[in-house]
Amino acid sequence: MVICCAAANCSNRQGKGEKRAVSFHRFPLKDSKRLMQWLKAVQRDNWTPTKYSFLCSEHFTKDSFSKRLEDQHRLLKPTAVPSIFHLAEKKRRAGGHGRPRRRDTGKASAGLRAQASDPVDGKAAAGSPSSSSASPMAKPEPRKLKRATPQGRTAARAARETAGQERGRQPLEGRAEDGPASAATSCSQGEAGTGAEDAGEEGATPADRGLVDRSGVSADDFTPPGSGACKFIGSLHSYSFSSKHARERPAVPREPVERKRLRRDAEPGCSGSSPGPEKGPAQSPPRACPSASSSLTATPQKPAQGASAPPTDVTPKPAAEAVQSEHSDASPMSINEVILSASGACKLIDSLHSYCFSSRQSKSQVCCLREQVEKKNGELRTLRQRVSRSDSQVRELRQKLDQLRRLSLPHLSSLLPPGREPPKMSPVVEPLSWMLGTWLSEPPGAGTFPTLQPFRYLEEAHISHVGQPMLNFSFNAFHPDTHKPMHRECGFIRLEPDTNKVAFVSAQNTGIVEVEEGEVNGQELCIASHSIARISFAKEPHVEQITRKFRLNSEGNLEQTVSMATTTQPLTQHLHVTYKKVTP
């Protein structure tokens, strides 16, 4: 991988120029604040740096580097920010490489073109490579030798251009009337002119545009007119050729000098003769030639599809061939060939640099993902709210269940062994079987008395048996709001065998023990106090008489009505409550 500078107008790359003259520094990807400063300084649109992105040292001031020894590499300070982005233009104006030599060589080439009218001089100039190489004066000055050769070729090119213009003035009707022979002749002339112009360009390019490298690539291959060095560096560094071709017209590739020379020697001309710079004309079978108005491009033309036609060469060309020449007009076919030749190398570089081909597509994907994440987060919030509501409801139900458990007394049947069946009811208490079970007051009971304020209460009644000829009962009252325990009462209900006479024996938490007797008629029991005993410190006024009435109504609910008489008040209704059966 060749390390290149990511600045827009900078052509510096690794291996170019003297060693250690230019150093390359990575973008601070881990420091977001400093990375934003670098991106603002670089000013590149739709571009994101990666670990393969570098900036050369020419974009930093001298105080941006730490002081080190001369043989050590440059080291940026932790706060260094690039601020210089016009060094390329200043360097050229200072006279380092290009323009002064172009002016000098341009003057020399202009002098040689003035002598191109003499055919003898033209031949001498065309043969200057062999003569100059044989002369002893050329050995101490190899650079002058290199410059003399392009000048001679420039003179030959000027002579052939004059001849081509004279041939171009002939009327088009004469060309159309000529036949296949005249067409082949014109094609051979066009190919010869093309070869001559190519040879002239080989000589004129280094003289007019700078020195030629040993590999045959001139400096203008990296700084094409109208596009700038940034396009070539961009195609190598971060831009994909395919996405760039969609934004702007792709550049027509320009082959280096050595590649042109090899192709011109290898490919035959239209008429079978193709003059080269060092070889004579060679015979080859005629083939179809392009029209005279088509531009000269360095890309290979597609051969005619036939049985003996060789396969099309789609090998990826060097990226330097994708640079457009100054006076070339690319046809649609040549553009496709440029895409085929340059896309391979650019795709390889894109895969190495791990860049995406479309930043807009990635942004749209990120937006879609954000919308989906927000939607899922909203659904998750609603689910959490529902779960919290259900949790609160479950908590309330558990609290109510715990309250009911605290209110209820343990059943007497729970004292029996777990594997034992419930006891069989005695036939003596069968007339009172409709009273068995656990009952809860619904609605709450009401209490009144002349000496008391009206009140309401909750009550649980539990009536059961253990196989004996009697019933066990307990009545537990609670405050309806605070569930505070209030009146409590428990005892036994006995029946006289073979009669309907019932005795009710109870003990209350108020310090009273009473015996009530009465009769049962169907599903109704009426009893009245027979004797009442109380503790010595019982609260006054003392209770002197109590009556009760139990009844099972048509809805299957149990009703109880209690009346009471004290030392100060006559017999008056005191309590009334309706029970609903909970368990049998």
From Swiss-Prot:
Known partners and oligomeric status: Homodimer.
Function as written in the Swiss-Prot or TrEMBL entry: Heme-binding protein able to scavenge peroxynitrite and to protect free L-tyrosine against peroxynitrite-mediated nitration, by acting as a peroxynitrite isomerase that converts peroxynitrite to nitrate. Therefore, this protein likely plays a role in peroxynitrite sensing and in the detoxification of reactive nitrogen and oxygen species (RNS and ROS, respectively). Is able to bind nitric oxide (NO) in vitro, but may act as a sensor of peroxynitrite levels in vivo, possibly modulating the transcriptional activity residing in the N-terminal region.
Family: In the C-terminal section; belongs to the nitrobindin family.
Lineage, uppermost ranks: Eukaryota, Metazoa, Chordata, Craniata, Vertebrata
Annotated catalysed reactions: peroxynitrite = nitrate
Cofactor: heme b
Pfam family, any one: THAP4_heme-bd
Basic and acidic residues composition-biased segments: 158-178, 248-267
UniProt protein name: Peroxynitrite isomerase THAP4
Residue span of region Disordered: 84-330
Coiled-coil residue spans: none
Record-linked SMART domains: DM3, THAP
An MF annotation (GO) of this entry: DNA binding
Annotated source species: Bos taurus (Bovine)
Free-text comment on the cofactor: Binds 1 heme b group per subunit, that coordinates a highly solvent-exposed Fe(III) atom.
Biological process, per Gene Ontology: nitrate metabolic process; tyrosine metabolic process
Enzyme class of the recorded protein, top EC level: isomerase
Classification via InterPro entries: Calycin (IPR012674), Nitrobindin (IPR045165), THAP4-like_heme-bd (IPR014878), THAP_Znf (IPR006612), THAP_Znf_sf (IPR038441)
Short motif (HCFC1-binding motif (HBM)): ranges: 236-239
Comp. bias regions, Basic residues: 89-104
Annotated localization: Cytoplasm; Nucleus
